[in-house]
Amino acid sequence: MKLRTCIPVLVTFALTLYLYLNSAESAYAMHIMEGFLSPGWSLFWWAVFLPFFVLGLRALVKITKEAPQLKLMLGLAGAFTFVLSALKLPSVTGSSSHPTGVGLGTVMFGPLPMSVIGSIVLLFQAVLLAHGGLTTLGANAFSMAVVGPFVGYFFFKLVLKATGKLKLAIFAAAMLADLSTYVMTSIQLALAFPSEAGGFAASLAKFAGIFAVTQIPLAISEGLLTVLVWNWLQSFNSEELSLLKRTMKGVAR
């Protein structure tokens, strides 16, 4: 990867980190804050998430062995996820709305590697930026690093097969990966805090409705931004994308 293609990502990453580390305001949760879920639900979501993490590690090891030149592209996917998911708007109590950034890495490498990349991003934000928490990392990672990428990948393949238009498929993948993350987060919150009147369904409608106000515009914006970044990669990283097409899942197929 050419140095000039790395500079914008590194500058954006550094600026975001600086602003959040030097912010005097209280940080909102990265999805679900530390201690917000009961120990039972925290353990449950960790148990659901960990198998995907293990499979993702195996996929990443395979990628780096077969095509070590793609390590910088993996780093770019992680930086893109970190920067976008750090741009938050306060939403439902104990949570927040923001882009997820997992769509780009999903269409390049497939959903399994993003289970690792996304969870590492969430871990860094929990430790360095006080967004989210360690006990709730399993729940947050399952929604953003598992559900989002798998849904995005499914619709990427579906739209690409139906229309043959790559950029439309990338837009759909990024937008729906974002929206599905928040549908899953709403389900997690509704399961943990069912409404006294109406139970799980009423609570789900409440959480999803509040999220939708901010998340639908954010998801559309993320889809457009991801397409713009893809255009940039095509212009300056054609060799790496050609290697992806030969060796990887995602855009490659």
Language-model regions, residue ranges each:
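N-terminal secretory/membrane targeting signals
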Residues: 1-27
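Membrane-helix interface motif
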Residues: 19-27, 186-198
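Hydrophobic transmembrane alpha-helices
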Residues: 27-104
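Hydrophobic cores of alpha-helical transmembrane segments in multi-pass inner/ER membrane proteins
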Residues: 46-55, 145-155, 220-231
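Hydrophobic alpha-helical transmembrane segments
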Residues: 71-76, 115-119, 142, 167-175, ...
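Alpha-helical membrane segments and adjacent membrane-interface helices in multi-pass membrane proteins
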Residues: 85-148
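Short helix-perturbing small/polar motifs within transmembrane alpha-helices
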Residues: 143-186
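C-terminal transmembrane helix-loop-helix hairpin of multi-pass membrane proteins
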Residues: 169-179, 198-253
